[in-house]
């Protein structure tokens, strides 16, 4: 059953933030610009993250402006039936600041040629930004909403090493400081249920994030995809996944630790069904969001509660249910 009522959404919703910021529904269009990662090509490691599906992938830095325009045009056309009027171009696949600076600029420049595009989001790693990259990205803040999305996953270096991330928590802190100095919005990706992490470790990662000057977060569920190192570990019985109920309760716990100014961009896994091994329940995105909202109501919980904030302090909570994030 879908949660209804003014108190249904007890967190700062990214959808609501965008609606208030732009006055209409805003849709993210994902772009694959053909990048790779430094823990795949040997710069810091090989093989990529142990949870990442590498099958059939080959970097393609020959993707240029024309292909970016085509992807954006297709995305805008596909979103029209949903009545989205404005769009954020999201460079999502792999590490989208890992390339020559002039190549990066030529790709980012293309998104602003679409009048419907009001923002740019760039997915990257904390070890793949420097002052030159930050200066380039900061230049676009005059044109619209600009986000750098950092894959952190965990604040514990031993976990980062175990999943072959190839960077440290300190490198993440350095990247946040550098990014914040130029006024670029920061979104952080975390994963609940990583091997070797208990509840306290999962919560500690988010306690640390709550003290940082970040603007958004994506909370992912660890899931197992085909053709990954973790798929082999899972088959060997070396990985225990969170149950649906455990994941829901952990998300509610995490939300209580985050201040209301951090908008929640995602609270679920994002796995292609054809490569997903487990858990199959993570495909039920809208149902999981409903479960989280029910759990918040049952526990009389809301974002920031553990920090002393009240429901009235949530700037982007919904007075009616939002579309799934």
Label each region the model flagged.
Residues 1-88, 324-325:
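N-terminal [4Fe-4S]-dependent radical SAM core
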Residues 1-16, 25-27, 216, 224-325:
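Auxiliary Fe-S-binding modules of radical SAM enzymes
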């Amino acid at each position: 059953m879908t949660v209804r009522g003014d108190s249904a959404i007890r967190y700062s919703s990214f959808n609501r933030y965008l609606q208030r910021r732009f006055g209409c529904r805003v849709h993210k269009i994902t772009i694959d610009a053909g990048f790779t990662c430094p823990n795949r090509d040997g710069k810091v490691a090989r093989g990529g993250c142990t949870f990442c599906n590498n099958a059939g992938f080959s970097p393609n830095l020959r993707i240029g402006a024309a292909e970016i325009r085509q992807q954006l045009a297709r995305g805008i056309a596909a979103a029209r039936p949903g009545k989205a009027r404005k769009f954020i171009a999201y460079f999502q696949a792999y590490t989208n600041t890992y390339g020559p600076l002039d190549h990066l600029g030529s790709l980012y420049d293309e998104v602003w040629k679409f009048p419907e595009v009001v923002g740019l989001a760039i997915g990257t790693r904390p070890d793949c930004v420097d002052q030159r990259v930050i200066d380039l990205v900061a230049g676009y803040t005059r044109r619209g909403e600009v986000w750098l999305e950092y894959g952190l996953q965990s604040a514990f270096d031993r976990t980062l090493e175990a999943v072959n991330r190839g960077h440290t928590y300190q490198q993440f802190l350095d990247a946040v400081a550098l990014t914040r100095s130029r006024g670029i919005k920061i979104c952080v990706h975390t994963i609940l249920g990583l091997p070797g992490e208990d509840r306290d470790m999962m919560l500690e990662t988010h306690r640390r994030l709550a003290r940082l000057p970040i603007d958004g977060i994506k909370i992912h569920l660890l899931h197992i995809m085909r053709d990954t190192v973790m798929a082999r570990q899972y088959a060997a019985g070396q990985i225990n996944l969170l149950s649906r109920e455990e994941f829901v309760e952990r998300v509610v716990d995490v939300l209580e630790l985050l201040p209301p100014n951090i908008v929640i961009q995602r609270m679920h896994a994002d796995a292609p069904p054809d490569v997903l091994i487990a858990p199959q329940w993570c495909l039920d995105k809208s149902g999981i969001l409903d479960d989280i909202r029910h759990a918040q109501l049952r526990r009389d919980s809301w974002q920031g509660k553990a920090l002393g904030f009240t429901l009235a302090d949530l700037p982007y909570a919904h007075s009616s249910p939002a579309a799934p994030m």
